[in-house]
Curated annotation (Swiss-Prot):
Induction: Cotranscribed with allF, allG and allH genes, which encode the oxamate carbamoyltransferase. Expressed under allantoin degradation conditions. Its main location: cytoplasm. Belongs to the carbamate kinase family. Optimum temperature is 28 degrees Celsius. Activity is twice as high at 28 degrees Celsius than at 37 degrees Celsius. Disulfide bonds: none annotated. It catalyses: hydrogencarbonate + NH4(+) + ATP = carbamoyl phosphate + ADP + H2O + H(+); carbamate + ATP = carbamoyl phosphate + ADP; hydrogencarbonate + NH4(+) = carbamate + H2O + H(+). It comes from Escherichia coli (strain K12). It is an enzyme of class 2 (transferase). This is Carbamate kinase. The keyword ATP-binding applies. Its EC number is 2.7.2.2.
Amino acid sequence: MKTLVVALGGNALLQRGEALTAENQYRNIASAVPALARLARSYRLAIVHGNGPQVGLLALQNLAWKEVEPYPLDVLVAESQGMIGYMLAQSLSAQPQMPPVTTVLTRIEVSPDDPAFLQPEKFIGPVYQPEEQEALEAAYGWQMKRDGKYLRRVVASPQPRKILDSEAIELLLKEGHVVICSGGGGVPVTDDGAGSEAVIDKDLAAALLAEQINADGLVILTDADAVYENWGTPQQRAIRHATPDELAPFAKADGSMGPNVTAVSGYVRSRGKPAWIGALSRIEETLAGEAGTCISL
């Protein structure tokens, strides 16, 4: 049986602008898990998820209790792995004919000298109105940036260098478990074992995981159903197949597609195995080449 790493897009957990409630997240997860369950019957499956809204919510709750010094961001990332991993595992385990589902708290090494620490760009937390920027920055010391028509907090997002718990993940996959891992991009730690105040991009973490465990494929699930040429124009066209070199211009795109393309291209170049970008609702068609975008050499 082949091994597949799947990175869930943010809409699998929470729709943009939705309240960060457990009920909303369970409802979205319930829509996502049937397709993942079908995959789990055909592949050894490792599932990576994001945590941007959730870790931002934990940070807000963390700041609300003034009697205790706020917990560092790496600890909050670990908390979000447990929260989201539990919700996914509960929902997946309830599917018929499911193999065992296990969540692995995953640490990923980053460099303390990564330039990302000087220029925070990773969005976390809920969306705010632009007119709230000054008050939020003054109250919490946050850095804020525009995310479409909204405003969100940004934190450092260093490059992942090594997944420290990959052996445990491999062992569980070989034993037939569906493994939820590298949640929120993994808990960032430096080579001396210290936690780092950052959030790693989950697609880059998924690509690194696929490389380290020698997976047979990598799937990045997004809000868009493929990579498009001339996006947003009457001439837009879905790209069904491309090489990493052909997709290179898209790696510089604004929004989430840039990191998506960077992640899959790095994996394909490193391992020579295929990767896909597509929508969760069409994941089986994407793997069959009937939807989404396949990236290969």
